[in-house]
Amino acid sequence: EMGIDAVTLANNHALDYGVDALLDTCEVLDGAGILHTGAGKDLNAAKQPVVFEKNGQKVALIGATRVIPEAGWAATNGHPGMLSSYEVSVEPLLQQIASCHADGEKVVVLIHWGIERDEKPQEYQRALAKRYIDAGADLVIGSHPHVLQGIEYYKGKPIFYSLGNFVFGSSIPKTMLVQAEFQGENLSLRLLPGISSGGYTRMLTDSGEMTQFYQ
């Protein structure tokens, strides 16, 4: 009903209730026709992208996390979990990005990272984002800090370090959506500011509200 076609499951709460709950989540999403990336029954499943195609253009979404409470939450060849993006375990993600890029797909990396309530990205976030783009990513979108963080371009590719909370019971109201449209080698972006409060998100349309939002 909300029009959600795909989600990333790579985050620091994905295994709060254990492996069975994670796999149950995957099954529920499958039953609802919602595609998912970033976690699964093993590493191969966790790193699989969600691929959309429209007008001959393929776009791959790859989810991963750099915030894992316990090492055992990371997916391995024989163990369920999430796709990890720590420096010691980032290679499967980089290889998946490169593979999708080689297949002619535009690659969007959905990465869970950063420090909660910190409006500035950590240096490791900036370093990882550049590695993703060097591997073939076209757009990087971050989550986890619960606040808006900065936007950076690297080699002409945009990095959104954090978009805040889309739907979340938080005292931090500012949030944002990014509308991205790939047309061949061109990427057009539109920023949609909003206010999230009490589990409800309202996108801003009034020019006065938007001016105040950006101040």
List the predicted regions and their residue ranges.
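Acidic, metal/ion-coordinating pockets
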Residues: 1-215
